[in-house]
Amino acid sequence: MGTVSVLYRERKAKFHTVLLDADQTLFDFNKSQRLSLKAALQKNGYPWNEEMNALYSKENLMVWKKFERGEITKERLKIERFENFFYKLGYKNADIAAVNADYIFHLSQCGFTIDDADTLCRALHGVCKLYIATNGIQSVQERRLEKSNIKPYIDGMFISDVLGCQKPAKEYFAFIFHTLQIADKSGVIILGDSLTSDMQG
């Protein structure tokens, strides 16, 4: 984020709109996931350790990539990640729906931001319009923004659940440009942690 901050300080006048990814660009998803998974598993009577967290991270990422490619729906994503997780742990009758519901609830309560995210947003506020562009689950994204220290600086949020298409599809960004009435795309910059999921469209 430090390098990005320098870039914006030097060139901020060139851009009028910044589209920011949510996870690991603004929000500390790794911390939020770890705490939420631990809480959800323990509430439902399952153990938790760092190895399990690493396994879930791997399975979750793989399923999200399938979603970004349009291979599965968001609802299927929520279930499949835990199906794969529990299968590899040897649990045959896990209450996946309950664990997923608790996981999503706890995730929505985590407004943790990464280092300097608030500094960046505060520096750009009033100079550029700041919008979050995310494939994340609507209830999670909206609630954790409310709990975060960056909310005062964010002008809006575009969530794939609401738009009906996801990053990096061209339709996703076309919807944003149409909604914001942006004709000159050269004044827009997209900031994220992944070329394939954030910017390729």
Language-model features: where?
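N-terminal helical cap/lid subdomain that shapes the substrate entry/recognition surface
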Residues: 8-22, 26-115
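Short acidic capping loops at alpha-helix termini that bridge into adjacent secondary structure
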Residues: 94-95, 152-156, 184-188
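Short coil/turn segments at beta-strand junctions that form active-site/ligand-binding loops
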Residues: 14-16, 128-129, 186-187
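Conserved Lys-Pro-Asp/Glu-containing loop-to-beta segment of HAD-superfamily phosphomonoesterases
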Residues: 166-199
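Substrate-recognition element of Asp-dependent hydrolases with the DxDx(T/V) motif
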Residues: 98-101, 106-112, 117-148, 154-160, ...
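Glycine-rich, phosphate-binding/catalytic loops in enzymes
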Residues: 34-38, 148-150, 176
